[in-house]
Amino acid sequence: LRGTEIFMDMFDNPDYLHSLMDYTTRVAERMASFYIDTGVDVLAVVDPVVSQISSRHFSAFLSEPFSLLFAFIRQEGVLSSFFVCGNATKNLDVMCKTVPDGIAVDENIDLAAAKQVIDRYNITVQGNIPLTTRMLLGTQQDNMAYVIDLFDQIEEIDRNLILSPGCD
């Protein structure tokens, strides 16, 4: 709704941004209701801004809206996934505090390190096979080798892990 102006609003117009986030949360809850009514099992909430802001700004402007949205989805009996593009490593901890059922991360996040953070909250981490360079342009063997290497880096692969493409 604001494009890149949202970044300036965090500094110049925080009250307006809070009211905008309240509005968009209500819209997101209504949209979630439509999806839930169709019978979805998991509802992904996608945010392109998280990787571009500080944890302080996330806490100030996004924590409450996301927490409310994930609580609403859970109350409706559906699982939620917090899907972020870009390197949101610095915000993984504050994202977990919004209590989604899963967090889907992009290919430029160290999945093994991310899983260590996210596991502290007993949240599932999802990601992050490179979609273009590995899956589209690579061979089947490239993909298999990538996954084996990734599994070798992750301490606990049998809990709270969904292997999938990143956001590309």
Please name every model-derived segment.
Residues 1-168:
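Active-site loop segments of alpha/beta catalytic cores
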